[in-house]
Amino acid sequence: MGVSRVLYVEGGTPLKGELRVYPAKNAALPILAASLLTPEPITLVEVPRLRDVEVMLELLAHLGTQYAWEGRTLHLQTPEIKSTHAPYELVGQMRASFIVWGALLARAGEGHVSMPGGCAFGFRPVDQHIKALEAL
Protein backbone atom coordinates (compact mmCIF):
# COMPACT_ATOMS: atom_id res chain seq x y z
CA MET A 1 0.00 0.00 0.00
CA GLY A 2 1.35 3.42 -0.95
CA VAL A 3 1.93 6.35 1.29
CA SER A 4 -0.81 8.95 1.07
CA ARG A 5 0.06 12.57 1.38
CA VAL A 6 -2.17 14.88 3.30
CA LEU A 7 -2.05 18.64 3.38
CA TYR A 8 -3.44 20.21 6.52
CA VAL A 9 -4.37 23.86 6.52
CA GLU A 10 -5.03 25.55 9.80
CA GLY A 11 -6.91 28.68 9.00
CA GLY A 12 -7.53 31.89 10.73
CA THR A 13 -10.81 33.38 9.61
CA PRO A 14 -13.41 31.29 7.76
CA LEU A 15 -14.18 32.41 4.23
CA LYS A 16 -17.61 33.93 3.78
CA GLY A 17 -19.27 36.53 1.65
CA GLU A 18 -19.83 37.01 -2.04
CA LEU A 19 -17.54 36.97 -5.01
CA ARG A 20 -18.51 38.47 -8.33
CA VAL A 21 -17.34 36.26 -11.17
CA TYR A 22 -16.82 38.28 -14.31
CA PRO A 23 -17.84 36.85 -17.66
CA ALA A 24 -15.17 35.29 -19.83
CA LYS A 25 -15.24 34.61 -23.56
CA ASN A 26 -13.45 31.29 -23.15
CA ALA A 27 -16.18 30.08 -20.81
CA ALA A 28 -19.08 31.47 -22.85
CA LEU A 29 -18.13 29.98 -26.23
CA PRO A 30 -18.25 26.28 -25.22
CA ILE A 31 -21.51 26.89 -23.35
CA LEU A 32 -22.99 28.51 -26.46
CA ALA A 33 -21.90 25.54 -28.59
CA ALA A 34 -23.39 23.14 -26.04
CA SER A 35 -26.75 24.88 -26.43
CA LEU A 36 -27.11 22.95 -29.70
CA LEU A 37 -27.53 19.76 -27.67
CA THR A 38 -31.07 20.50 -26.50
CA PRO A 39 -34.30 21.80 -28.01
CA GLU A 40 -35.14 23.38 -24.64
CA PRO A 41 -34.83 27.14 -24.01
CA ILE A 42 -31.62 28.27 -22.32
CA THR A 43 -30.93 31.51 -20.49
CA LEU A 44 -27.37 32.66 -19.87
CA VAL A 45 -26.61 35.69 -17.69
CA GLU A 46 -23.60 37.99 -17.78
CA VAL A 47 -22.57 36.92 -21.28
CA PRO A 48 -19.76 39.12 -22.63
CA ARG A 49 -20.73 40.97 -25.80
CA LEU A 50 -17.53 40.38 -27.70
CA ARG A 51 -16.85 39.78 -31.39
CA ASP A 52 -16.20 36.04 -30.92
CA VAL A 53 -19.49 35.67 -29.03
CA GLU A 54 -21.34 37.48 -31.84
CA VAL A 55 -19.68 35.28 -34.49
CA MET A 56 -20.60 32.15 -32.52
CA LEU A 57 -24.20 33.37 -32.34
CA GLU A 58 -24.23 33.94 -36.12
CA LEU A 59 -22.96 30.39 -36.57
CA LEU A 60 -25.56 28.97 -34.18
CA ALA A 61 -28.32 30.92 -35.97
CA HIS A 62 -27.20 29.37 -39.26
CA LEU A 63 -27.47 25.93 -37.63
CA GLY A 64 -30.96 26.61 -36.26
CA THR A 65 -30.62 28.55 -33.01
CA GLN A 66 -32.93 31.43 -32.22
CA TYR A 67 -31.56 33.98 -29.77
CA ALA A 68 -32.34 37.33 -28.19
CA TRP A 69 -30.31 39.64 -25.99
CA GLU A 70 -31.84 41.30 -22.95
CA GLY A 71 -29.04 43.48 -21.61
CA ARG A 72 -26.22 41.05 -20.76
CA THR A 73 -28.66 38.14 -20.57
CA LEU A 74 -28.90 35.87 -23.58
CA HIS A 75 -31.95 33.72 -24.33
CA LEU A 76 -31.46 30.95 -26.88
CA GLN A 77 -33.20 27.89 -28.18
CA THR A 78 -32.53 25.41 -30.96
CA PRO A 79 -35.86 23.65 -31.59
CA GLU A 80 -34.30 21.78 -34.51
CA ILE A 81 -30.97 21.60 -36.30
CA LYS A 82 -31.66 23.26 -39.65
CA SER A 83 -28.20 22.73 -41.11
CA THR A 84 -25.29 20.46 -40.26
CA HIS A 85 -22.91 22.54 -42.39
CA ALA A 86 -21.00 25.28 -40.59
CA PRO A 87 -20.07 27.83 -43.27
CA TYR A 88 -16.39 28.65 -43.60
CA GLU A 89 -17.19 32.38 -43.67
CA LEU A 90 -18.04 32.05 -39.97
CA VAL A 91 -15.81 29.14 -38.91
CA GLY A 92 -12.81 30.86 -40.44
CA GLN A 93 -13.27 33.90 -38.20
CA MET A 94 -12.89 32.16 -34.87
CA ARG A 95 -10.96 29.20 -33.51
CA ALA A 96 -13.68 28.18 -31.03
CA SER A 97 -16.22 27.61 -33.81
CA PHE A 98 -14.76 24.13 -34.24
CA ILE A 99 -16.42 23.01 -31.01
CA VAL A 100 -19.90 22.99 -32.57
CA TRP A 101 -18.88 19.80 -34.39
CA GLY A 102 -19.40 17.53 -31.38
CA ALA A 103 -22.81 19.00 -30.62
CA LEU A 104 -23.89 18.57 -34.25
CA LEU A 105 -22.77 14.94 -34.22
CA ALA A 106 -24.60 14.27 -30.96
CA ARG A 107 -27.85 15.95 -31.93
CA ALA A 108 -28.06 15.47 -35.72
CA GLY A 109 -25.80 12.48 -36.27
CA GLU A 110 -23.52 14.42 -38.60
CA GLY A 111 -21.62 17.66 -38.83
CA HIS A 112 -19.57 19.38 -41.49
CA VAL A 113 -17.16 21.92 -40.04
CA SER A 114 -14.07 23.36 -41.74
CA MET A 115 -10.77 23.62 -39.95
CA PRO A 116 -11.02 26.63 -37.65
CA GLY A 117 -9.56 30.03 -38.32
CA GLY A 118 -9.13 32.83 -35.82
CA CYS A 119 -6.05 34.58 -34.58
CA ALA A 120 -2.52 33.40 -35.27
CA PHE A 121 -1.73 33.01 -31.57
CA GLY A 122 0.81 30.23 -31.64
CA PHE A 123 0.33 26.62 -32.63
CA ARG A 124 -3.00 25.21 -31.42
CA PRO A 125 -3.71 21.83 -32.98
CA VAL A 126 -7.18 20.32 -33.09
CA ASP A 127 -6.03 16.70 -33.46
CA GLN A 128 -7.24 15.75 -29.97
CA HIS A 129 -10.74 16.98 -30.86
CA ILE A 130 -10.67 14.91 -34.04
CA LYS A 131 -9.46 11.78 -32.20
CA ALA A 132 -12.25 12.15 -29.64
CA LEU A 133 -14.89 12.50 -32.35
CA GLU A 134 -13.51 9.51 -34.26
CA ALA A 135 -13.84 7.43 -31.11
CA LEU A 136 -17.59 8.08 -30.94
PLM segments and residue spans:
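Structural preference for solvent-exposed beta-strand-turn elements
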Residues: 1-136
